[in-house]
Design a protein with these regions (language model features):
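Short glycine-/polar-rich loops that comprise or flank the Walker A/P-loop
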Residues: 1, 33, 58-59, 108-110
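N-terminal beta1-alpha1 ligand-phosphate binding loop
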Residues: 1-29
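Conserved RecA-like P-loop NTPase ATPase core
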Residues: 5, 62, 96, 129
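Short glycine-rich anion-binding loops that position phosphate/pyrophosphate groups of nucleotides
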Residues: 11, 66-69, 97-101
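Short glycine-/acidic-enriched loop or helix-start segments at secondary-structure transitions
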Residues: 15, 72-74, 102-105, 124
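Short, glycine/charged-enriched secondary-structure capping and boundary segments
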Residues: 18-22, 75-79, 107-110, 127-128
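Structured adenosyl-cofactor binding patch, chiefly the S-adenosyl-L-methionine
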Residues: 104-149
Length: 149
């Protein structure tokens, strides 16, 4: 399974400490899935990239959206496990532009996912998603990382 953590509105090459920690969590996921991070300048660029993925490795599009579904870590792990067991080859978790997702993008998504009612900076949202992906895999494999939640 391939996982991509995508975000819109990025300046090419801009990195900070939060990005470094996000990368740590994505690397921790490597025993379970191939993970990478992708930055896109615009929503249109991301949507075009997603469309191109359909020919190679069909992607499940999960858009992070304040109006989306909230999940506990356990429910998120179960959702991810179901996608894996159904044979999903590629899941893209995308953090949108500051103005929010267009209706076209929302309609294209298989899941709108909310991290909660608070607004997060894009870098922090990426970190939270990366950590929750790692946590989900540890829940699915019975690893003690989540045991003391």
């Amino acid at each position: 399974m391939h996982l991509t953590l995508a975000h819109v509105g990025a300046r090419p090459g801009s990195k900070d400490e939060v990005d470094a920690l996000t990368q740590v969590y994505l690397e921790r996921c490597s025993p379970f899935a191939r993970c990478r991070s992708e930055a896109f300048r615009t929503e249109d660029a991301l949507m075009e990239w997603l469309q191109k993925q359909q020919g190679r490795m069909p992607a499940v599009a999960v858009l992070l959206d304040s109006r989306g579904r909230t999940m506990t870590s356990e429910i998120f792990a179960a959702w991810l496990g179901m996608r894996r067991d159904e044979g999903a080859q590629h899941i893209v978790f995308a953090i949108g532009p500051a103005s929010g997702w267009s209706q076209t993008a929302r309609d294209r998504a298989q899941l709108l996912l909310s991290l909660g009612p608070m607004t997060l900076a894009h870098a922090l949202a990426r970190l939270v998603v990366a950590e929750q992906l790692y946590r989900a895999f540890t829940i699915l494999t019975g690893h003690p990382y989540h045991a003391g939640h």
